[in-house]
């Protein structure tokens, strides 16, 4: 079928046959079982569980944490699959059959699919295996039968390699694209032996970051594959470094032998790195090779360049990432990572084409970022130097990779700020080395570390060319407490450190000033106007980020940049349509997610949802994208936290927008009111400009006269009423009372007087019984209006009183009592009273008072009965009324006789009488003339012999507002005193004219609180309802049911009974219905609600109307009281049916975590060995009587309390040191038991109790439904739908409860077995609850001891190095001193010695103390720096000694400050000079 292969292929085939015969690769005929891990580790199903079925054939490099491979398929081909059975490979081969051996595989030779399908499947297999280029090329030349055998074996050993699914996909793709597929396969898989196509090298993707980098591009290693779009990404996996040689190792050795890879060459080192066989010694050799950088023979390139071309840099980053994932590292791993970083530093120092190596450096940056928190200070310094070198390349992709790596580090540590883990380690190092005992030896390392770290910080900030980005990253640094670090670094007093801090603060101040200026410009300028032509060119594609635009990452939102972009030519706008760009980006991986997002948005737009719902969803998506692109680094890359924070910020923004919307509406309303006020003001100003001022003054004066007349009438009425009371005797017959409304005395009053005067005493009917009591009640209570009065145009007295200006009441004349002459009759029909009834008729009872009169001001007192037509005549007119005074102005004609005087007013009205309206008979034009006549009459006839009343001495005007009251001793009888002779009216008028009373009203005003009382109408409309519930329970009803406040009691009760979705979804309401207070009824409450209750079983009606009850009582009655025979069962069942799913998921999650912890503890042999080491060392230390075969877990808590003889190291530190130095493989138990960290919030006892509670609830509710209170439907309310609502959920709950109890039983059994395995008592509740906690505490303390030991050893190693350098320097000086036998210069004379001393003193005096501008700079920039840390995060110190160290630092700072104030440096120099002078003089003596 195929032409014979070339010679090179036959040589390789021979090697394959040898491997077959050695049973190492292909011969499975004699094996009864599938390959074991020892023989074929890459196909071990157990290893596939960790490595997701992918092997690095030939490279033994572990990828336990790497994601599974992506077997990309053509979705279009799958969707276009036809239904014909002949199109599927399954008609020839059934992949479900197990392939147990090679013999079984040979039985399927006759079931091979077409050659094209096999070739495509074999390409898929090669895409998940890593072979050298020549091996891949040779394997492609194998026959179809051989390829099929390898495919069957892979299907058997790798459960992720689903041959059936892949066959169907390949078949569909082949049939739908037959022509293109055949042409493509002819070019790639040609069988021609005459001309071999040159292999095409294509980058192979290696997922190296596990979960941290699963969304990023992967590093590349050169691999020979055909350029097929279906080729998936590849992963690197370890084949192991121990055991028998695997298939891949044998194949790699054979290929290396044929290719003659020379030992020590760059390719050889790369192959060793990828095979995970690079030892520490090899790392040192590699570092030496990179330092020497010799030219490679026969290549013309340097050794470093050859290593780079072989993708050694990427391979080193993969190994470094693998080491970084370990929590506990051995000393060899610490040394190896340090050497790898040194190698990467040498590689980055090599000059080469930076654009081609940019992708490789991305993964180098991500691997290096995790070492910024390494326990070793030397490693951190070196890593920071390499990162600074990479940042100096000023590539935005590297900058973004560094931020992504820091975000992954943040997520791993569980911090809240992206730079927090890094700067926390930085700050701890500063605090530790600042107080180190060997301060002189460690200070240089600290200064170097601080300087290079500050350079890196400034470089990362400087990489942001956008102001917005710089502000954002500075805020992140500020939240990570960088200003506190600056304060600590300032105490070191190093010039380099101060310069870097100065640089950071100076640039921060400049950015702050630029931000403030830009904000002012944006607030003052309007948005630029976009031309219509350019607006048409803006399409959706202009807002889609392309891969090229991703490298920029700088999107400044400043207005000037927007104007620059819009001011460009039209050619700058991309005219391609969105779909065109989307189609071009189909093959680009980064656009796949973009395409998916946009397709979902289009699907949402085309859905049947309403426009409002679509708009809300688009707003949420937009807010989330904005948060992810701009601010997600603050909280890391966790999807749940990003979503939660996005939704929270959106809700805050919406609430803020709602408040702003209300404020805008309110401002608009106030603006309209302001415009109306301005218009009114303009009208008033126009009136003032005209010549109407005099007219206004005259009108005001007339108003004053009218008001004065009204006051005079009030006084006159008061006097007449008092006189009538004096003339009445106790035996007189009571007069009938007729109530008068608030109109006062108008035309109707005059008409009544006319009728009264013309009636005779014989026509009066007898006085009705009870009239005296009625008269008293009329004066105090409401007023009834007779039918003769017309109230159509009536106004309350308060309106007239308010409309009367006080200032106008100054010169009003008083109304003098006189007899009115006859007047012509009036023809006014309204004023005419009704004719009197028959002479025998009796006065009718007063009609009911109208509503509008009840709510008005206090009415005037009722007039006597002579106003009624059938009332008795009044008493004779007093003598002082009969006078010869001039007649008053003519009255209306209907008054023909002299009217009788009105009755006096009651005493309570004379104090503050409300003024009645002006009589209708008085016209404004005649007021002045009438007042003049009254004044003249008043002067001609003074009053004598009459005792003054209160109405005489009270001023004619009363204050509008209440004044402070005078407290004096009143005289009731002033007949024989001077008070009776005073002219009160003259004095009062004079006070009014001079404005004294107005001034008194302003000066002595009293502040009174307005009490708003309910009117009688309101009390009738809202009758008081009854309430029997306690106040707390009523409040609980209002709080828990506040969302249904708009519903009536009947609708709410029906909603509850019908199990409305609003009730079911509100769990707080369901929990409230299960409150004991709603079920337990007191005796008094039972008796009070019994008359209002009904029973749904008997259908009886309530004795009283339930509407009399308050809202809470009515709801309680209808639900809790009337349904009390099954309300408890109903509420419990309803709540459980709505919450059991959530509880079930939560309990199953906790049980799964416990299962994982059980499995991890039982499988961790490293933990058992560490415990064995502890027991062995402890038995060695103990006497014979304390020898132990084992120990309980409580012993682990006491390891940190035993210290060595110097109290510098605990027993736990020593155990960690033993494990790390002698048993480094056992240190992996920390990573093996990482799942225990999720158990700290889970209590085993509480978990079992919750599971039992759920089982008990299911049982009780089921019993209620089957034979309990919910079983009989007749006992339920007719509208109650509880049975239909909970029947289906309870059936599902029973099944889930059975699964939960089974899982609990299995988990409890495994836990009991595990506790017994570790020597604990499963029946002890305390031991059961603290079982996992003991391991968690031990692991935490062990990790802490590991870090402390590493740092202590590094310090000791640094100390030894410096000590050796110092000793060598001293020895060298001694040796030079011995060799040079020259005598020392001796000062012979005292003059020379004194000259030396004087010179020394001059130098000391001339030296000035070192000063810095730190304080001045800090004050100048404090405002700018506070801008970047407006909301600093209070970060808890990781070490318990930090607070003590801070206290020491503050005390030392205070001491230094005190010393600086008392002893300046110049004085210290003088003291030292004096001491030296004293010593020299003593030597001379």
UniProtKB/Swiss-Prot annotation:
Compositionally skewed regions (Acidic residues) per UniProt: 553-564
Gene3D superfamilies on file: 6.10.30.50, Formin, FH2 domain, Formin, FH3 diaphanous domain, Leucine-rich Repeat Variant
Domain spans labelled GBD/FH3: 110-636
Keyword match Coiled coil: yes
GO cellular component terms, semicolon-separated: cell septum; cellular bud neck; cellular bud neck contractile ring; cellular bud neck split septin rings; hyphal tip; mating projection tip; mitotic actomyosin contractile ring
GO BP annotations, alphabetical order: actin filament bundle assembly; mitotic actomyosin contractile ring assembly; septum digestion after cytokinesis
SMART domains (UniProt xref): Drf_FH3 (SM01139), Drf_GBD (SM01140), FH2 (SM00498)
Composition skew (Polar residues), residue ranges: 231-248
GO molecular function, one term: small GTPase binding
Region (Disordered): 65-88, 226-248, 549-575, 746-874, 1447-1471
Superkingdom of source: Eukaryota
Entry keyword set: Cell cycle, Cell division, Coiled coil
Compartments, as annotated in UniProt: Bud neck; Cell septum
Description of the deletion phenotype: Lead to a cell separation defect.
FH2 domain span: 953-1368
Coiled coil segments of this chain: 660-734, 1240-1312, 1351-1382
Keyword Coiled coil tagged: yes
Pfam families for the chain: Drf_FH3, Drf_GBD, FH2
Subunit: Interacts with IQG1.
Function: May organize microtubules by mediating spindle positioning and movement in the budding process. Required for cytokinesis and the maintenance of polarized hyphal growth.
Homology family: Belongs to the formin homology family. BNI1 subfamily.
Record-given protein name: Formin BNR1
Organism in which the protein naturally occurs: Candida albicans (strain SC5314 / ATCC MYA-2876)
